[in-house]
Amino acid sequence: MLKHSENSMMTAVMDYAVIVARLYEKALTLGSLTLNTADEYVMRYESDYCFIDQYYRLANETYFGIDPTCELFDAVQKVKRCLDQNYSKLCNRINMEWTRCLKETGGIGEVHLLRQQNFYDERIKPIQKKVAVIVSDALRYEVAKELIGELARSKHIASLKPAIAMLPSETKYCKPSLLPHRELKLYGKGEEQDMAVDDHILDTTLKRSEHLQVYRDGAVCVPFETVAEYNLEKNREIFKHPLVYIFHDVIDKTGHDGNAKQIVNSCRDASTELKKMIPKIHASYNVTEVYITSDHGFLFNDIMFTDKDKHKIEEDCLERSTRYYLTKSKDEVNGVVKFPLNEVSGMVNVSDVMVAVPMGTNRFAAPSGGYMFTHGGAALQELIIPVITSRQERDDNKQPVGVMILDRRLSMQASRLRFKMLQTEAVSMDMKERPIRVALYHNDVPVTPVKDILLDKTDPSLDNRKIQVDLTLNKNIDAKVLQLKVFDATDELNPIIKENVTNNTLIENDFDF
């Protein structure tokens, strides 16, 4: 039997096993994957499907932290190979049904979400006070879901809503559409296409700033790195502007050329950077509203794609990639779904152009390559993008999370008490973290070291909010009953928990010849 705390590598193996088990547990409770409407798929993606993606990413992140010299590594590799295949098959099945539903029920127009190209008009334009927008390239919805849990520990209030990206779910089309515009147009450049915003290609930060200022006087666009590297004084100059668009590129920049380890680590890096930056923008630069969104999501599978796994494109096309191609052909193609580009993109000069995407999560054979990490298609993971709204508000009304002892009979053995506590609520936008102090007492004097514990878990699962506590006597005590006391760290006069503990150490000593 492995002890979780004895060996860091064994700990990593056990953590990996737990995450894999959670993924399979979630997968087994999904029920039928055949739903009636596109909106139902979006709701299921928010509530269930996105956690499959999250657990797969976290499983990979944990796997790459396991030392290959670990004695259980061969067994872990076998589990991973099975997981990679099973996850790939499940994602494909979900998205086969999703794309079938889109095809049969009227396309993306039947999805009742904020359309990406309307983001500025519907979310930013009505705001008259100072606002910042962070556009994080390839920030997938499930990564944002994890981020919102981290932001719950901050004093500001944040909420997460889904929106739907344009097709193709590609940076050069989706990112500029988040800026204000009168019209979007497809702009041909040989065998590649681009998108003009009000007849301009906005492919640099300077061009985006100049364009933004046409719609809001004094607005500015800056790279995330600039804000991260600047000192307080320089950043205060940036955030004097009424509207600041910040472009953040960690996941996409790493993903296209990275290996599996680099891809999952880039998600962690992006989340960490955003988690630090958002409260800083609120607190240091007096910006009351910050929006965080993405140009698109991505598909990620740590498997080899052979030629037989790649769908060959046999039609004439304007542009092609691993997850889409643009064509003027309206002919039906086996394994491919086509949408009128003007209905799924917001572009106005493309009435004769179709965007073709593979059913499910299949990949097209394309000279651009990039199969492990890819986007451009119509999978839920690519199209459903996050819109996080963070507002600077006082958290005086937030209640601290609760705590309870799970063990019914507390007894001390060999001078040690081991028991489990439960953080009764998850830290959220309604509940704040709680620092507590725990010790054993006799006559109101601590007889073990006082243990400081921060109840800050954001996981909705009760099992993942359990905490094991060990207390060891540091004084000779002849009392048969001691008291376990738990205090809120801000009030050490009134315990929130007080339980009797049988001192079996004394009984053992009575028979110690």
Where are these regions (language model features)?
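Feature captures the catalytic ectodomains and active-site-proximal regions of enzymes
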Residues: 1-513
